[in-house]
UniProtKB/Swiss-Prot annotation:
Cited Pfam families: DuoxA
Taxonomy of the source species: Eukaryota, Metazoa, Chordata, Craniata, Vertebrata
Gene for this chain: duoxa1
Residues that carry a glycan: N290
Main location: membrane
Protein name, UniProt field: Dual oxidase maturation factor 1
Length: 308
């Protein structure tokens, strides 16, 4: 390739902004929450606010479980370095290089400092999925054919199967099990919501506990990859280091919240069953029915006394 002649995209490049799947999940949860808020005035009794809190908490847990399966910030890292812009070229570029790892693959970002350099806007975000080894290798070969900037190709090469780093095997296995266990957590989330809607509270509590355990086990599976030897991704004297991202910590907080709630509900079931019935709107209806029956019996007794 001749100097200063770079391949370019056949169409204008649009950098990655938001994942449409995440937006769809957020919209569905917001619409569902608004629906429950609208019907809230039609609910009788003092347990109205408790019912709304229970619904919103359950929606939050379900939304997190579903969303983190598609996010790309379980592990992340950025570095600012001066590096070669294109392969087989002497043009240097000062840019911020980012690595974003999720359960479905990774994203590599490249943003120039400033953005406009070398007569073009440097703002890349390339996705490399690893749902299968062939898919990742195909994405990597496509990146080479398209002539992507050297930093993106260099980082992606570290995750290929043929690389000596072994990052693909480490991350692919850990994310495979993490994603699978997280989907089991989502299934158990659906089950405990169904069980809570029926008078089988104890089984619902058990399934909520299973949901929490599955989330925590999924996090442990993902974190286990950091115990393996790390292959350095180096740009000059700087090393691109990663750390746990927003999705990891959000999943951890949600899993602990789900665990605490299940243990509290189990404690109430053993010690204060009436309080638990009030939370799930069971006790109030029973008390009202008993009260109406007592009033009918009392009125019938009074009528008999008047006749006598």
């Amino acid at each position: 390739m001749q100097a200063n002649i770079f391949p370019f995209y056949p169409q204008p490049r649009t950098p990655f902004k938001f994942d449409t799947k995440i937006i769809e999940i957020i919209i569905i949860c917001i619409v569902t929450a608004c629906t429950f808020i609208i019907i809230l005035p039609g609910i009788r009794g003092k347990s109205r606010s408790i019912w709304l809190l229970r619904i919103l908490t359950s929606l939050f847990i379900g939304a997190v479980i579903l969303a983190v399966n598609f996010t790309s910030d379980w592990e992340m890292g950025t570095i600012t370095a001066t590096t070669v812009y294109k392969s087989f070229s002497h043009s240097m570029l000062n840019a911020s290089i980012g690595l974003w790892i999720g359960l479905k693959g990774l994203n590599i970002t490249l943003i120039g400092n400033p953005e406009y350099q070398l007569n073009e806007t440097i703002n890349y975000n390339e996705e490399f999925a690893w749902e299968s080894a062939n898919q990742f290798e195909t994405s990597y070969k496509d990146a080479l054919e398209r002539g992507l900037p050297f930093p993106i190709v260099y980082v992606a090469e570290k995750f290929t199967i043929s690389s000596d780093c072994g990052l693909f095997q480490q991350y692919c296995i850990s994310t495979y099990y993490s994603s699978g266990i997280m989907w089991i957590a989502f299934c158990s989330w659906i089950l405990y919501n169904v069980l809570f809607s029926m008078p089988v509270i104890l089984y619902g509590i058990y399934m909520m506990f299973v949901t929490a355990i599955c989330m925590l086990v999924s996090l442990i599976s993902f974190a286990s990859v950091r115990k393996a030897p790390v292959c350095n991704i180096q740009f000059g004297n700087s090393i691109l280091k990663t750390h746990f991202g927003v999705s990891y910590w959000l999943s951890l907080i949600t899993g602990l919240l789900c665990l605490i709630i299940s243990l509290v509900l189990l404690f109430l079931y053993k010690t204060q069953p009436k309080v638990l019935q009030l939370i799930f709107s069971y006790g109030e209806e029973e008390d009202l029915s008993n009260k109406s029956e007592n009033e009918e019996e009392h009125s019938s007794v009074l009528s008999l006394n008047e006749i006598l």
